[in-house]
Structure formats: C-alpha cells, structure tokens
Amino acid sequence: MDDLLKNLTACLQDQAEAMRDALKHLVLIQSGTCNKAGVDRVCRAVYELLEPLPLERRILPQEKYGDMLIASTAAGGGGRRILLAGHMDTIFPADSPFNGWREDGHFFYGPGVIDMKGGLVVGIFALKALATMGLLRELPVTWLFNSEEEIGSPASRPLFRAEAGHAAMAFVLECGGINGEIATGRKGRLGLKLSARGRAGHAAKVVEGKKSAILDLARVIVELEEVNGRFPGVSVNVGQMAGGVVPNSVPEKAWAAIDVRSPSAEGISFFRECLDGLMKRREAEGMELSVEVVSQTPVMEATANNKALFAVIAGEARRLEIPVVEHFRAGASDANTIAEVGTPVIDGLGPIGEHDHSDREYVVRESLRQRSALLALSLIAAWRRYEAGTLFPDG
C-alpha cells in the first residue's frame, strides 16, 4: 500500500464517527423541496461543516426555494475547474411520518440518508481528508449545493450550466448502486401536461352527442401507453389524471401528466412524432386537445470522456479493493444538465444504499468511508492526468 492510500484510509477511519454524526445531523433536518425553512437549515449546517476547510463559501439566497451554497478552493487550474454537485433537498415534506434516524447494525435509516445527504457527507469528508494531507490546495474544486433537484432544478439549472462551462470535469454525488454501480450516462426526461376540452351538460340529459373531456383523454392515454416498447429504451407513463366537477355533469375539462424517458435524443423525438400524429388524428375526429411541456431534461450520453473518467475511478477502486460497475441509469439528475454543456461528468459517487424516495431508505454505513476515499483518490488522479494531457481520448 503506497503512502497516499495508507494515509488517506487512516484519516477517514479516524473520521468514521464524525461522518456518522454529520449525516445524522443532516437527516434529522426535514428538508423536502417545498420546505424552504428546512432546506435553509441544511444549507447552514453544510456551510458550518465546510468551515475548517480552505474554501471560499457563499450562500446564494433564494425566495421560492431553499438557499443554495457554492464553495471553491483558491487553486487556479489554468482557468478550468473540477465541479462537484450535490442537492440538499429531499422528497419528504415537513409533516412526513418518515422522519428521525435509526441505526441497525451496518445500516442507517432516515429521510434523505442516501438521496442525497449521504452524498454530501461523502464529499465533505473527502475534501477534509485531502486538506489534512495538504493535497486540497492543488485542486481547483468548485462545489454547487442546490436546493430543488427533486423537482428538476428549475432555479439552479442556469447555475450548473455556468459552472460546467468552466469545468474540465464534474462529479455528481448521488448514491451509488447496491452493487457499486456508477453512472456514465442517464436517460433524458420529458414532462408533459395533456389537456382535453369537452362540452359541459347535465349527465341525465346529454346522451347522444355527449362530448366528455375525460372520455376523450382516456382514449388518448391508452394510445400513449402503447408507445412503450416501440423505440429502444423509451418509456412512457401517464402518472396523473384529473377532470370534471361533479358526477352528474359531463366533464368539460380534463388533464393528464405524462413522464417520458429515453436514453437518446432520437427516442424523445420519436415520442414527440407519435404524440403529434395522435393529436392530429384525434382532433380530426372532433377532439379538442392541447399539450404543454412542463419540464425537459437532456440525455446524459455515455461519452468516451465520461468513460475515461470512469476508468480512473475504477482504477482507484481496485486500489481500495471495493467494487464499482459502469452503469447507465434510467433516472435523471443534475448530471444531465452538466452533460448538456459538454463537460465530462460521472454520477453515483455517493454512498451505497437502497429504497430512496420511500420510508425504507437506508445507507450502508461502511460505504460512507469507502466512497469518501474513492472520491478523494479519484479527484487527485483525474486532475493529475488532466494536467498531463492524458485523461481524455482527445487530450
């Protein structure tokens, strides 16, 4: 074992209880995206956890969502940076029955314990270990902590684009897969609201010629679900539907929320063509339909540069004797936005656990230390190769 590896693992072993305490402190603050006060408290707690480090810290006040935080080292990097990304919000509202902290052997349970407060702790203690060994000062790191990732990062997306434009590479600290999966690519997402308009009337009197918005929309929904399986990797889900006023009135209005996922831009285009054709045909039959794009997240393609970054991480994982697996994830994250700028990015460097977005969410205790060591080693190795011009296939 070389000195760097030996000293790093010893440093993080000494910090194991501090990592646990930091994670518990963050998890006990309920910070659902719409709970601004809770997210603000997490932001302040993270700000304080970073205080011992040689970082310039700036809280970015927000009106609608929780405050955000940006922290940077002073290292120049020739104008290029290493971008880290992590979000402070969870899906659990302030009054969620899933609250508190529980320990059971090798596992910690609690809201956001892997999605993604565990990732925040992994990153913070990786930087602490590098600072302790005098290595952080050579890394031009910028870390953006955002507050509304769980609803698609509507406020922070421009910030990520701006920071990614200055970055040579990026690491997103969402949780790792249960078998050590790390993402080199992610599906893109298209969120739509499809609306139908009918003609209101008394249900007892309107029999022939009834124009029901709900009935029209239901027929369209069946066709939309049939798009599944028609293009590689494309999934379509109509997750919400509502309409009408009372049971004895023909519904004049109805709407449905549609979630579309695709591993390629071509897949999204295919779905849009299917939807456009369906709407034109149904409108010719007399239906009144309209569609609104609610959200859109670009595909994070598994590029050669992303794979080059993963190769560095895999090499450091072998030194640590922990498993990692290259993976293409179905869900979207802030990594998609970073990739849209063209910056090489890896996601899933946070701790290992399961059942995020549920009351069974847990993290494997030992993975906090392991993934912190992996991140620290990968930052050093990737930056040194980048400076030498040997990191990416195109130099």
Language-model features: where?
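Acidic/histidine-rich catalytic neighborhood of metal-dependent amide-processing enzymes
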Residues: 116-187, 383, 387-394
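Acidic/His- and Gly-rich active-site-bordering loop/insert found
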Residues: 2-111, 132-136, 335
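Metal-dependent amide/peptide-bond hydrolase catalytic core
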Residues: 1-7, 31, 61, 175-176, ...
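Acidic-glycine-rich active-site phosphate/pyrophosphate-binding loop
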Residues: 89-104, 171, 185-195, 350-351
